Amino acid sequence: MKFQRIQDLRVDSDLSQRQLGEILHISQRSYSHYETGSRGIPIEMLIRLADYYDTTIDYLVGLTDNKAPVK
C-alpha cells in the first residue's frame, strides 16, 4: 500500500526524504520505504507523522479526507 498522503505532505512542506528522516530520527531509506509502501509504517511512526503535520492518523492512511484534527 503506497502512502501517497505522507509523500504529498512532505512535498507540500518543501522537505526531502532525507530532511524528514532527520526530523523523525530515521534514515532516508527507511522513510522512503514507508512512502512507497514497501514496508508498513509502525503505529509509533504514524503518531509522530500526525503530530508533525498537525493532522490525524486517519487522514494519513486515507480513512478520511478531513486533514484537520478534531480540537
Question: Model-derived features: where do they sit?
Answer:
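Short basic helix-loop element that most often maps to the first helix and adjoining turn
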Residues: 4-23
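Conserved hydrophobic/aromatic packing and binding residues within compact polymer-binding modules
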Residues: 6, 20-21, 31-34, 60
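Helix-turn-helix/winged-helix DNA-binding modules
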Residues: 1, 12, 38-41, 52
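Recognition helix of helix-turn-helix/homeodomain-like DNA-binding domains
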Residues: 25-40
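DNA major-groove recognition helix of helix-turn-helix/homeodomain DNA-binding modules
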Residues: 25, 44-59
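Residues that mark the N-terminal boundary/hinge immediately upstream of a DNA-recognition element
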Residues: 5, 16, 42-45, 56
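DNA major-groove recognition helix of helix-turn-helix
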Residues: 35, 53, 61-64
